[in-house]
UniProtKB/Swiss-Prot annotation:
GO terms for molecular function: acetyltransferase activity. The keyword Transferase applies. Gene3D superfamilies: Nonribosomal peptide synthetase, condensation domain. The keyword Acyltransferase applies. This is Trichothecene 15-O-acetyltransferase SAT16. Pathway: Mycotoxin biosynthesis. The lineage of its organism: Eukaryota, Fungi, Dikarya, Ascomycota, Pezizomycotina. Substrate binds at residue 154. Trichothecenes are sesquiterpenoid toxins that act by inhibiting protein biosynthesis. Its EC number is 2.3.1.-. Belongs to the trichothecene O-acetyltransferase family. It comes from Stachybotrys chartarum (strain CBS 109288 / IBT 7711). Trichothecene 15-O-acetyltransferase; part of the satratoxin SC2 cluster involved in the biosynthesis of satratoxins, trichothecene mycotoxins that are associated with human food poisonings. Satratoxins are suggested to be made by products of multiple gene clusters (SC1, SC2 and SC3) that encode 21 proteins in all, including polyketide synthases, acetyltransferases, and other enzymes expected to modify the trichothecene skeleton. SC1 encodes 10 proteins, SAT1 to SAT10. InterPro entries: Tri3/Sat12/Sat16/Mac1.
Length: 184
């Protein structure tokens, strides 16, 4: 088992909390191999990380009984689009290289697990959430027009928040970022 020592990062301006996990090459390979063996070769460590983030967030959610079957979770994740753009587009679409993609995880009630649950129950929830993440992320990755759209959405939100910072004051979203080098 890989032992991770997260480092908490805070910023006095917005006080976000972040955890940076630095894995050595062997640890990354072990995780990637496990993901590809358990789910299928097309899955990456980012899908598992997105699933684990949502499940961990649900574990801290105080109103679990209020979740209904159709409830879902949406968050943005970073997409490294460089490897998906055609060579003739690379010089013209720099803004679309690194952009955000909304990930939608459905049926949250089915993902409510606890550390006291059996390993099979926890793994099943991770698999289900990872499949949701992959389905949504693939939609953005394989449609090149979506990469540029994501960038425009972030530019719009940035412009709005600079004009009216109070607009997003009470908004909080888990944010997962992976450059993609660990997925090749």
């Amino acid at each position: 088992m890989v032992e991770l020592n997260p480092v908490t990062i805070t910023n006095d301006n917005a006080t976000p909390r972040g955890h940076v996990l630095k894995l050595i090459l062997v640890e990354s390979r072990d995780i990637i191999r496990a993901v590809k063996t358990r789910l299928c070769p097309q899955y990456t460590i980012s899908y598992l990380a997105q699933a684990a983030t949502v499940i961990a967030m649900l574990d801290t959610y105080s109103s679990k009984s209020e979740l209904s079957k159709p409830d879902f979770f949406v968050a943005l994740t970073v997409v490294n689009g460089r490897r998906y753009l055609r060579e003739d587009l690379e010089s013209n679409y720099l803004a679309g290289y690194v952009t955000g993609a909304p990930i939608k995880i459905e049926k949250l009630r089915s993902l409510l697990v606890s550390l006291d649950d059996s390993k099979d129950i926890i793994v099943s929830a991770l698999e289900k959430a990872a499949k949701d993440a992959k389905r949504r992320l693939d939609m953005w990755i394989y449609d090149q027009s979506q990469l540029a759209t994501g960038f425009r959405i972030h530019s719009f939100k940035g412009a709005m928040s600079s004009e009216n910072p109070e607009l997003f004051k009470k908004t909080a979203v888990p944010y997962l970022s992976s450059y993609g080098i660990n997925e090749v």
